[in-house]
């Protein structure tokens, strides 16, 4: 189902990032950078392992945010 970037997915990812950032009173870019969000909306990882392979996502972010982002991406891919 890949084929370029999904604008809708990118916006949804931004929304989720803001929600997670607000919960911790962090700037959004600390959670994940825009570059990473673009990569996510293109590659659309549907497992936490795949999420962790995205450039810019380390082990810490994979464990901390993987579940939420993967869940959102799955809703778009199905």
Which role does the model predict for each range below?
Residues 1-78:
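Accessory DNA-binding and partner-docking regions appended to nucleic-acid-acting proteins
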């Amino acid at each position: 189902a890949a084929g370029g970037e999904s604008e809708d997915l990118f916006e949804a990812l931004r929304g989720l990032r803001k929600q997670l950032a607000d919960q911790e009173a962090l700037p959004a870019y600390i959670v994940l950078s825009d570059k990473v969000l673009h990569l996510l909306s293109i590659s659309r990882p549907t497992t936490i392992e795949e999420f962790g392979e995205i450039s810019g996502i380390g082990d810490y972010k994979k464990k901390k945010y993987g579940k939420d982002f993967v869940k959102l991406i799955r809703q778009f891919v199905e």
